[in-house]
Amino acid sequence: MKLLSLPCYCGSLRQVARAVTVLYEQVLGESGLHATQYTALQVLDEAPGLTTTELAQAIGIDQTTATRTLALVKKGGLATDSVGSDRRERRWVLTSKGQTQLRTLRPRWEAAQEAFEKRLGRRAAMALKRASYQAASRLMSN
Protein backbone atom coordinates (compact mmCIF):
# COMPACT_ATOMS: atom_id res chain seq x y z
CA MET A 1 0.00 0.00 0.00
CA LYS A 2 1.28 3.48 -0.76
CA LEU A 3 1.61 6.28 1.76
CA LEU A 4 -1.70 7.99 2.46
CA SER A 5 -2.23 11.72 2.75
CA LEU A 6 -3.66 11.85 6.26
CA PRO A 7 -6.42 14.27 7.24
CA CYS A 8 -4.78 15.64 10.40
CA TYR A 9 -1.62 17.60 11.13
CA CYS A 10 -0.48 15.18 13.82
CA GLY A 11 -0.57 12.12 11.58
CA SER A 12 1.05 13.95 8.68
CA LEU A 13 3.89 15.30 10.80
CA ARG A 14 4.47 11.88 12.34
CA GLN A 15 4.80 10.42 8.82
CA VAL A 16 7.49 13.00 8.07
CA ALA A 17 9.23 12.42 11.40
CA ARG A 18 9.36 8.66 10.83
CA ALA A 19 10.70 9.04 7.28
CA VAL A 20 13.38 11.51 8.38
CA THR A 21 14.34 9.33 11.36
CA VAL A 22 14.82 6.31 9.08
CA LEU A 23 17.07 8.36 6.76
CA TYR A 24 19.27 9.62 9.60
CA GLU A 25 19.40 6.36 11.53
CA GLN A 26 20.60 4.57 8.40
CA VAL A 27 23.72 6.76 8.41
CA LEU A 28 24.30 6.12 12.11
CA GLY A 29 24.41 2.46 11.17
CA GLU A 30 26.50 0.27 13.40
CA SER A 31 27.32 3.06 15.86
CA GLY A 32 24.47 1.83 18.04
CA LEU A 33 23.12 5.36 18.42
CA HIS A 34 19.63 6.49 17.54
CA ALA A 35 18.82 9.94 16.19
CA THR A 36 17.70 11.31 19.57
CA GLN A 37 20.92 10.12 21.20
CA TYR A 38 23.04 11.71 18.47
CA THR A 39 21.07 14.95 18.83
CA ALA A 40 21.67 14.90 22.59
CA LEU A 41 25.41 14.52 21.97
CA GLN A 42 25.33 17.47 19.54
CA VAL A 43 23.56 19.67 22.08
CA LEU A 44 25.90 18.68 24.93
CA ASP A 45 28.86 19.41 22.69
CA GLU A 46 27.52 22.93 22.07
CA ALA A 47 26.25 23.51 25.61
CA PRO A 48 28.07 21.33 28.16
CA GLY A 49 26.70 21.19 31.68
CA LEU A 50 23.00 21.22 30.83
CA THR A 51 20.61 19.61 33.25
CA THR A 52 18.35 16.80 32.10
CA THR A 53 15.43 19.24 32.04
CA GLU A 54 17.37 21.84 30.03
CA LEU A 55 18.40 19.22 27.48
CA ALA A 56 14.80 17.99 27.19
CA GLN A 57 13.60 21.55 26.57
CA ALA A 58 16.40 22.28 24.09
CA ILE A 59 15.56 19.35 21.83
CA GLY A 60 11.82 19.26 22.44
CA ILE A 61 11.40 15.93 24.20
CA ASP A 62 9.71 15.03 27.46
CA GLN A 63 11.61 14.52 30.71
CA THR A 64 11.19 10.73 30.66
CA THR A 65 12.59 10.43 27.14
CA ALA A 66 15.50 12.72 28.06
CA THR A 67 16.27 10.64 31.16
CA ARG A 68 16.19 7.41 29.13
CA THR A 69 18.29 8.91 26.32
CA LEU A 70 20.93 10.22 28.73
CA ALA A 71 21.05 6.91 30.60
CA LEU A 72 21.83 5.15 27.31
CA VAL A 73 24.59 7.58 26.30
CA LYS A 74 26.01 7.33 29.83
CA LYS A 75 25.93 3.52 29.65
CA GLY A 76 27.84 3.76 26.35
CA GLY A 77 30.47 5.93 28.03
CA LEU A 78 29.62 8.91 25.80
CA ALA A 79 28.46 11.32 28.51
CA THR A 80 28.75 11.64 32.25
CA ASP A 81 26.67 13.39 34.87
CA SER A 82 27.37 15.13 38.14
CA VAL A 83 25.19 16.49 40.91
CA GLY A 84 24.16 20.10 40.35
CA SER A 85 23.47 22.80 42.93
CA ASP A 86 20.23 21.02 43.81
CA ARG A 87 20.98 17.40 44.76
CA ARG A 88 18.14 16.21 42.50
CA GLU A 89 19.69 18.01 39.54
CA ARG A 90 22.07 16.22 37.15
CA ARG A 91 24.45 18.16 34.89
CA TRP A 92 25.69 16.43 31.74
CA VAL A 93 28.92 16.68 29.73
CA LEU A 94 30.40 14.60 26.94
CA THR A 95 33.26 12.28 27.76
CA SER A 96 36.29 12.15 25.48
CA LYS A 97 34.75 8.98 24.00
CA GLY A 98 31.54 10.93 23.34
CA GLN A 99 33.46 13.74 21.65
CA THR A 100 35.33 11.23 19.49
CA GLN A 101 32.10 9.44 18.56
CA LEU A 102 30.49 12.74 17.61
CA ARG A 103 33.45 13.71 15.40
CA THR A 104 33.46 10.25 13.79
CA LEU A 105 29.74 10.33 13.01
CA ARG A 106 29.50 13.98 11.94
CA PRO A 107 30.44 13.32 8.26
CA ARG A 108 27.75 10.62 8.07
CA TRP A 109 25.21 12.95 9.64
CA GLU A 110 26.13 15.66 7.15
CA ALA A 111 25.68 13.11 4.34
CA ALA A 112 22.15 12.50 5.63
CA GLN A 113 21.56 16.26 5.59
CA GLU A 114 22.68 16.37 1.97
CA ALA A 115 20.51 13.37 1.04
CA PHE A 116 17.52 15.06 2.68
CA GLU A 117 18.17 18.28 0.77
CA LYS A 118 18.65 16.37 -2.48
CA ARG A 119 15.30 14.59 -2.12
CA LEU A 120 13.34 17.68 -1.12
CA GLY A 121 15.37 20.41 -2.78
CA ARG A 122 17.48 22.79 -0.71
CA ARG A 123 14.90 25.59 -0.57
CA ALA A 124 12.08 23.24 0.45
CA ALA A 125 14.30 21.57 3.07
CA MET A 126 15.28 24.92 4.59
CA ALA A 127 11.67 26.14 4.52
CA LEU A 128 10.54 22.94 6.25
CA LYS A 129 13.25 23.34 8.91
CA ARG A 130 12.19 26.93 9.60
CA ALA A 131 8.49 26.05 9.68
CA SER A 132 9.17 23.07 11.96
CA TYR A 133 11.12 25.22 14.42
CA GLN A 134 8.45 27.93 14.42
CA ALA A 135 5.68 25.39 14.97
CA ALA A 136 7.55 23.62 17.78
CA SER A 137 8.40 26.94 19.46
CA ARG A 138 4.80 28.14 19.36
CA LEU A 139 3.24 24.84 20.37
CA MET A 140 5.67 24.23 23.25
CA SER A 141 5.51 27.73 24.73
CA ASN A 142 3.28 28.16 27.74
Task: Enumerate the predicted regions with their spans.
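Short, locally clustered residues in the helix-turn-helix/winged-helix DNA-binding domain
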Residues: 14-17, 42-46, 106
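Charged, amphipathic alpha-helical coiled-coil/dimerization segments
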Residues: 21, 71-130
